[in-house]
Amino acid sequence: KGALLSHGNVGRLLTATAGEFNFGPHDVWTLFHSYAFDFSVWELFGSLCMGGRLVIVPYDISRDPQQLHRLLCDEGVTVLNQTPTAFRQLLPIACASPRTLALRQVIFGGEALEVASLRPWLERFGDQRPSLVNMYGITETTVHVTCRAIRLADLEGKAPSPIGLPLRDLRWYLLDSQLHPVPVGVAGELYIAGAGLARGYHGRFGLTAERFVPSPFDASQR
């Protein structure tokens, strides 16, 4: 996309999520995703800036859930980031394996998460360790906007894909085409404001002006 993100954008992402995850030197992360995918920014800097260890997953292992499970066990991985599609391939292998995983956080992103697909995992491992966390966001907002831990009770809940609440330094608004808040029950567009926004798109000034609009609620914000 050519989104212009600063070091400060990434730094504040780690600060804004510190209370939820308590990442530190005790953690072992995987670099599962291509560095062309924004999820890798979270993996790279989330591990190294917090003093953790980063295990680079070879491409062939990332496409083989049996080998991936073996790597997770052998390396003592504690933080795993996955798209829901990739995790669905790993799930049955982990649930059937006698080996113990060291995971304490599994973080989902990149696409919509269907909670019902996690039933076998939650029934096998529970919802505490590892904690399963759904994070929602896009490149233009520095990877993540919201955070929501998934619980066993969500299997019986009404929300098929709960995304939670914004990170503490972000705000969200559901607006119509005139940037007015929509009433409850009326469809609208989700707008994000706060410290995570990119500067814009590289060399695309028209698109930047179209997508990054002044906030109608705070003149100092977009």
Regions found by a protein language model. Name each.
Residues 33-37, 60, 139, 194:
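Conserved AMP-binding
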Residues 85-87, 113, 197:
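Alpha-helix capping/helix-boundary segments
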